[in-house]
Curated annotation (Swiss-Prot):
Family matches, as Gene3D superfamilies: Single helix bin (1.20.5.570), UbiD C-terminal domain-like (3.40.1670.10)
Lineage: Bacteria, Pseudomonadati, Pseudomonadota, Gammaproteobacteria, Pasteurellales
Protein name, UniProt field: 3-octaprenyl-4-hydroxybenzoate carboxy-lyase
GN (gene name): ubiD
GO molecular function: 3-octaprenyl-4-hydroxybenzoate carboxy-lyase activity; metal ion binding
Catalytic activity: a 4-hydroxy-3-(all-trans-polyprenyl)benzoate + H(+) = a 2-(all-trans-polyprenyl)phenol + CO2
Amino acid sequence: MKYKDLRDFLTLLEQRGELKRIKQEIDPHLEMTEIADRTLRAGGPALLFENPKGFDIPVLCNLFGTPKRVAMGMGQEQVSALRDVGKLLAFLKEPEPPKGFKDFLSSIPQFKQVLNMPTKVLGKADCQQVVLKDEDVDLYKLPIMQCWKEDVAPLVTWGLTITKGPLKKRQNLGIYRQQLVAKNKLIMRWLSHRGGALDFQEWKETHPGEPFPVSVALGADPATILGAVTPVPDTLSEYAFAGLLRGTKTSVVKSVSNDLEVPASAEIVLEGYIDPNETALEGPYGDHTGYYNEQEYFPVFTVTHITMRKDPIYHSTYTGRPPDEPAVLGEALNEVFIPILQKQFPEIVDFYLPPEGCSYRLAVVTIKKQYAGHAKRVMMGVWSFLRQFMYTKFVIVCDDDVNARDWKDVIWAMTTRCDPARDLTLVENTPIDYLDFASPVAGLGSKMGIDATNKWPGETQREWGVPIKKDPDVVKRVDEIWDSLAIFENEP
């Protein structure tokens, strides 16, 4: 199922019982977070608050609050089908020429999908039905949520920030939280390695002192939203990837005040600039770690224009101790990562990012071990191959007889196959998430790899234990008589 815009997606969700309309008056200040948090933890539906207190614009929360809805947003019916999305990305990251005619025929579906990569530029679009500028720009009229009691101010959370480096051929889409500080100003919290920050740095070097154009889209179609959080290859734009997911080209329209192209179907678009000389102290905010973060200076985004539909929907979320929406997204996108990793490391059997690990801070990898030291190679590969894992603090590597998604299995492997002095790998002075206050220096800390694999000659001088295995004939015989034993039935 493909969706032309957010409303198309919401219609389907409502038909399937995956969307709940809240007609009571609910306050964007704290109350929406409490309701959304309870709903997400119970595996509940997306929420459309139709009567936000003090505002006349509905608020959409919990849109991707279950892995199933993430899969639906990517045009798939099952979470397991996201592996196919990962295979497509692996193909695009390192395409290989067909090995023969039969191989060419099998590649045709992938090449057909590539035809949907270019964007379709429109002359006018629904996202520009209403245009506000100059004194009419007032961000306080948007129902921007304040999520936690100690948050310093309301926070824009689901904005797709659109930038373009002056030396780059394509635009970048990224999602960065934005603190409301004035009727026309937001603090743009982007980390230095993210696409928007890199574009900004490039602009400052080539256009010193000049304002940097920025547009922010809220409420785009699900393929475009998810394209901004997926590990898209550097050579592929998020719009192009959204076209692949949707099966049709992404429709865009030029911003009214700059040359950046924004999703034509967006609900609301903020346009403006960042003055290279203007920064402000951001935070504190409760974030995906479950703690309030430190304050830090970031660039200020000055909004000069707001464009929107005549009856827009404001798309929002909250972040907090897992599970939250980012954790659910991470759980679903886990399936996308696996084929990409397997393309580079075919020995990987499974890869799992437990949601409790704040989406990316801990990874469990199972491999078909082939030689001594293999586990350490995989650890280093996980940390270096995709930038999504540059902040992963812990990597646990197990054999393929271990279920990476079962903590009981993983802990059994760690406690029986791992010697701390021999099998722990510590790497110091590596990039760490700025929100990780456990690191000794902001943005710089250590990583740990745990080799929980069976040890090969050269890794140990001792005879290695042989795992206990049941006799299959006995298992079959007991299966046949099991019901008649009535072990779990109460005696009369």
